[in-house]
C-alpha cells in the first residue's frame, strides 16, 4: 500500500532517515514499519538534508501489508481491461515490467485525466517497474479521434514542442527519471522521418480496414465524418509500441479505457512482426456517478498548471465533488492507505464533508505542494464561514479596455470574465434567481454596474451560489 508525504513529518525526521535521493530506508510510521522512498529530483546529495522541500521533495511511504501491487490496483478499481492477466500480474508484482503510457501534447498543461495516469505510473515505479512517458510529438500532429465527435484542431510544430516542454516539467514532479528509473521519449524521433511507402508495406499490411472500423471510436466518427488523417492514428500508435519494444524492451502499454482498440493493435503488430508477446491494460476512466467524465468545470478543464487552474480552484473542485464520487476518487487518485479509505466509506452526513476536505487537500498537496494546499484549505474554510480572508481566492484582473467610456462595467460582464458563468444569458439567470452577491450583498438587478474606482486596489468579491468565488480588481 502506498502513501505519499510531502515535507517529511517530524516523526520521520527524528527516525534517522538518510536523505539520499532515490534511496529507500526503513522507518516507523504510525506504529508500522515502512519503507521510505525519497525522490528529490536530484535536489539532495548523500547525507544532506533536502533543500527547499516545499513543492520539490516527494516522500513516498510503502507500508508493509499482505497485498500485492496487482491486488491493490484491483482493490482501488484502477483496472478496466487486460489482455493477459496472469502474465501482467506476474510482471508488475515482481518489478519486471517496462511499460508506457502515451501523452499527446494537445495543450500546454496536463489535466486531471493525465494525473490519474501519472499516479498509476508512480505506483508501479515504486514496485520496481520502469515507466516510459511517451510524448506524442508525432501523433500530436494528427490527433486521436477517440472520444471525439469532430476533428481536433491542427497544431503547429512550434505549438506541439512548447506543449511538450510544459509536459516534461510537470511530469518530473511525479515520476523519478533519474538513473534510468523511468524514461521520457518523444515519438517524433521515429514518426517524423517515416517513409510513407515503407510504412504501408511494413506496417499497413498487418492491419485490416474492416477490423479498424469495428473500433468504437471509429464507428462513432464514421457517422459524422472521419478524415484519412485520423484513420491512421491506430496504425501510428501501434507503431509506437512496436518501436518502444525494440528500443527499450517495453512489453506493456497502459492507457485509458477508450484506447483499448489502439492498444490491441500494438500487441498484434509486435506479435506479427517480431513473434513476441506484448501486453495491454486499460485504466478505469474517471467518471462521476452519472457516467460523465470528471475533471471539467463550467470554465473548462481542471489543469495541473497553477496558472491555468489556481490551487484554490483545484482544491474547490475536489471539495465540491458529489457525495457518491468522493470514495471512488480517494481510491483512484490518492495514496492514502486503503484501510483508511474503507473507514471513510462508513461515514455519512456531515462526515462526508470531512472526507471531501481530505480528498481536496490530498490532491492539491500532490499537485501543488503542501504550502499551496494549506493556503487553499484556509481560504476555502474562511469563505465557507463567511470570513473576509480573500488572500488565497482566485482573482481576475481587469484591463482598462474592460470599462466603458464612463469608467463602468456591468455585473454580467464581470461574471463572465471571472468564469463564474460561461455566457451572458447564464449570468442574467443567476442574478434574477438571487444567486449572485457582491461583497456579501445579494444583487438582483441585471443592469447593476460597478465603477472603476470601486474595483481599484482590493476590488470586490463576487460570489455565485454557495461555493464559487472570485476577487475582481483593477490597478
Task: Provide a role label for each language-model segment.
Residues 18-20:
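Compositionally biased, intrinsically disordered low-complexity segments enriched in Pro/Arg/Gln/His
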Residues 270-475:
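Conserved nucleotide- and phosphate/pyrophosphate-binding catalytic cores
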Residues 57, 62-259, 264-267, 274-279, ...:
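NTP-dependent nucleotidyl-transfer catalytic core
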Residues 40-48, 53-56:
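Low-complexity, intrinsically disordered Ser/Thr/Pro- and acidic-rich segments
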